[in-house]
C-alpha cells in the first residue's frame, strides 16, 4: 500500500515538521508514505473573486500533475463526508481489499480547492465543518491514517 499526501504550500515551522516526521516514521511499518508539497499562489486580503479563482486554478494544475492515474483520490473538503476514526480505517481497508494499492489525499491551500481537483476526487472527506491551517491538517491527517492502520491491525493505540 502506498499513500501520497499532496498539500499546497510548504511546512515552514519546525514543530509541524517534527510532528509530520514522527507520523511518517510510525507509518513506515504499515505503508510507504510520499509527501508532496506544491507551491501556493501569493495571497492577499484584497484579492477579487476572479483572482482567487485564477490562483486556485494554478494550484490545481500543480496538484493534478502529481496525481497518479491509478490512485484513489480523497480530497479534504469542508462539505465532504465526515467519518469517525473507525469508519476511516474501514474505508481505507475496503480500498485495500478491492485492489486499490495507492491512496492519495489532497489538502488545499488557503483559498480551498479548485473544481478541477474536486472533479478528480473519488471521495470528498471532511474532518470538521471548521477550517484548519493546512499545516495542522497535514499532521491531523497523518495521525488519523496511523490510527486507522492501528485499528485495522487490532492494535491498542486507538483506545
UniProtKB/Swiss-Prot annotation:
Record GO terms (molecular function): rRNA (pseudouridine-N3-)-methyltransferase activity
Reaction(s) the record says it catalyses: pseudouridine(1915) in 23S rRNA + S-adenosyl-L-methionine = N(3)-methylpseudouridine(1915) in 23S rRNA + S-adenosyl-L-homocysteine + H(+)
This protein's UniProt keywords: Cytoplasm, Methyltransferase, rRNA processing, S-adenosyl-L-methionine, Transferase
Intrachain disulfide bonds: none
GO cellular component: cytoplasm
EC number assigned by the record: 2.1.1.177
InterPro entries: Alpha/beta_knot_MTases, RlmH-like, tRNA_m1G_MTases_N
Localisation per UniProt entry: Cytoplasm
Sites where the protein binds S-adenosyl-L-methionine: 76, 108, 127-132
CDD domains, per the entry: RlmH-like (cd18081)
Assembly and oligomerization: Homodimer.
Cross-referenced HAMAP family: 23SrRNA_methyltr_H (MF_00658)
Purpose: Specifically methylates the pseudouridine at position 1915 (m3Psi1915) in 23S rRNA.
Family statement drawn from the similarity comment of this UniProt entry: Belongs to the RNA methyltransferase RlmH family.
This protein's name: Ribosomal RNA large subunit methyltransferase H
Organism of provenance: Macrococcus caseolyticus (strain JCSC5402)
Amino acid at each position: 500500500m502506498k499513500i501520497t499526501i499532496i498539500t499546497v504550500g510548504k511546512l515552514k515551522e519546525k514543530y509541524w515538521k517534527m510532528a509530520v516526521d514522527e507520523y511518517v516514521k510510525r507509518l513506515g511499518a504499515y505503508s510507504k508514505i510520499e509527501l508532496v508539497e506544491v507551491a501556493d499562489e501569493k495571497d492577499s486580503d484584497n484579492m477579487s473573486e476572479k483572482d482567487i479563482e485564477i490562483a486556485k486554478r494554478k494550484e490545481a494544475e500543480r496538484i493534478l500533475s502529481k496525481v497518479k492515474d491509478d490512485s484513489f483520490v480523497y480530497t479534504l473538503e469542508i462539505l465532504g463526508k465526515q467519518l469517525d476514526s473507525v469508519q476511516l480505517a474501514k474505508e481505507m481497508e475496503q480500498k485495500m481489499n478491492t485492489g486499490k494499492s495507492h491512496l492519495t489525499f489532497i489538502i488545499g491551500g488557503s483559498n480551498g480547492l479548485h473544481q478541477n481537483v474536486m472533479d478528480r476526487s473519488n471521495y470528498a472527506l471532511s474532518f470538521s465543518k471548521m477550517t484548519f491551517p493546512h499545516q495542522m491538517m497535514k499532521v491531523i491527517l497523518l495521525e488519523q491514517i496511523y490510527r486507522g492502520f492501528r485499528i485495522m491491525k487490532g492494535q491498542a493505540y486507538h483506545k
